[in-house]
């Protein structure tokens, strides 16, 4: 096989098919690495795992710069008086997150789950009140712009890019062209990085399955079934209903496209931030309004947290059922609201949704000791829970953005 054919095989054709091939090869390497270790003298899965580490690192590195220039260029070049769809998208984000939490409450009662609490996890850094979560968000907004980029504080990056973009709307055309050229240049770099996704998935799958395997999840089958089942129900029932409300036609082709193109990558990177470039590429292919998606997708990565709301709710109710506590409907409804609010701030908390479990548990008087043990359970099942949560969160960002953009096209065509 010559070099050009090898390059064509590895980097051209359907990205989804190439990612699927990387997934299968990763599973194969994970299965054979242990038997081969004595023969070759090293763990093959650990060695190829560096490909996944490099891929995720590259995505996370380019994401802040991409957001900064893309949002700033889009707003600076936006004609004054042009209608914005951001209000409708934010409403969908918040509504989708609340409905996900509410569905999780129902699932938690229909399928009550108990877990064995034995291990403890440090919860000292967990926020103690909703106000603390909101305060963290405010601090992230007013962060130094260079610090926000260096530390990948996406709320801060978004705030500064929006501010500068609006301020530069009256700048000269030459300045606006420079911003657009920078945004285009970063987008091309993103395209190159995404072309390496099959290698990244290959490394991530091989290392993850070899390191933890699926044996560690055996004791939490019911909890995982309720968690993942609720997330799938949200992705394929709740979200399509919201999308149909906007586009007034069969939502499933769009839903499936977003799950396939965005959700699969997010599942393996386990990072909404790292998946922002993937979502922006998908939005381009869907021919969505750049001025809309360049803002809504980074924003969604920070506040559109249906998966996190489900995780917080299900694990909190698992603690409730394990302790044999009685919960009223009003308390459950309050849990939905608190979980949705906490989820929106999950991106501003180290450890994400898991470290917000003590906050939700405090609604029912559950001790920090028990809540900390639930965090430990979350880390054990994280190999599937965190991956599925991220896939739901990230794919919904581009899904809701597309729904609102398509609604606008439908209204303009009418």
Curated annotation (Swiss-Prot):
InterPro entries: Na-dicarboxylate_symporter, Na:dicarbo_symporter_sf, Ser_Thr_transp_SstT
Record's keyword terms, sorted: Amino-acid transport, Cell inner membrane, Cell membrane, Membrane, Symport, Transmembrane, Transmembrane helix, Transport
Source taxon at top rank: Bacteria
Broad class of the protein's primary localization: membrane
Gene Ontology biological process: serine transport; threonine transport
Record-annotated disulphide pairs: none
Cell location: Cell inner membrane
Alphabetical list of PANTHER family matching this protein: PROTON/GLUTAMATE-ASPARTATE SYMPORTER (PTHR42865), SERINE_THREONINE TRANSPORTER SSTT (PTHR42865:SF8)
Protein name: Serine/threonine transporter SstT
Organism: Haemophilus influenzae (strain 86-028NP)
Gene name linked to the record: sstT
């Amino acid at each position: 096989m010559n070099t050009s054919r090898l390059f064509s095989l590895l980097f051209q054709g359907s990205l989804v098919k190439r990612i699927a091939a990387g997934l299968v090869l990763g599973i194969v390497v994970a299965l054979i690495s242990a038997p081969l270790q004595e023969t070759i003298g090293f763990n093959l899965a650990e060695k190829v795992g560096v490909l996944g580490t490099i891929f995720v690192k590259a995505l996370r590195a380019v994401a802040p710069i991409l957001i900064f220039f893309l949002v700033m260029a889009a707003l600076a070049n936006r004609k004054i008086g042009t209608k914005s769809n951001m209000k409708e998208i934010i409403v969908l984000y918040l509504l989708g997150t609340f409905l996900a939490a509410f569905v999780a409450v129902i699932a938690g009662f229909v399928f009550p789950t108990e877990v064995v609490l034995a291990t403890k996890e440090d919860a000292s850094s967990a926020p103690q009140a909703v106000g603390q979560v909101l305060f963290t968000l405010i601090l992230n907004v007013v962060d130094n712009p260079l610090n926000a980029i260096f530390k990948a504080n996406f709320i801060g990056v978004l705030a500064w890019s929006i501010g500068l973009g609006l301020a530069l709307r009256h700048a000269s055309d030459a300045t606006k062209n420079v911003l657009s050229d920078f945004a285009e240049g970063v987008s091309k770099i993103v395209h190159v990085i995404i072309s390496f996704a099959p290698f990244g998935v290959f490394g991530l799958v091989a290392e993850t399955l070899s390191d933890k395997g699926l044996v560690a999840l055996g004791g939490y089958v019911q909890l995982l079934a309720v968690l993942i089942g609720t997330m799938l129900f949200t992705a394929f029932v709740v979200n399509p209903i919201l999308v149909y409300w906007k586009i007034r036609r069969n939502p499933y082709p769009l839903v499936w496209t977003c799950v396939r193109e965005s959700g699969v990558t997010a599942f393996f990177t386990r990072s909404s931030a790292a998946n922002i470039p993937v979502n922006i590429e998908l939005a381009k292919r869907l021919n969505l309004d750049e001025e809309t998606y360049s803002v809504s997708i980074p924003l969604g990565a920070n506040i559109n947290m249906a998966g996190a709301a489900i995780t917080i709710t299900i694990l909190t109710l698992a603690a409730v059922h394990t302790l044999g506590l009685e919960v009223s409907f009003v308390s459950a409804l309050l849990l939905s609201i608190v979980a949705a609010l906490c989820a929106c701030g999950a991106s501003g908390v180290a450890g994400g949704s898991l470290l917000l479990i003590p906050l939700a548990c405090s609604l029912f008087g559950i001790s920090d000791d028990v809540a900390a043990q639930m965090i430990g359970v979350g880390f054990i099942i994280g190999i599937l829970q965190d991956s599925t949560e991220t896939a739901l969160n990230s794919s919904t960002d581009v899904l809701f953005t597309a729904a609102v953009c398509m609604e606008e096209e439908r209204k303009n065509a009418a």
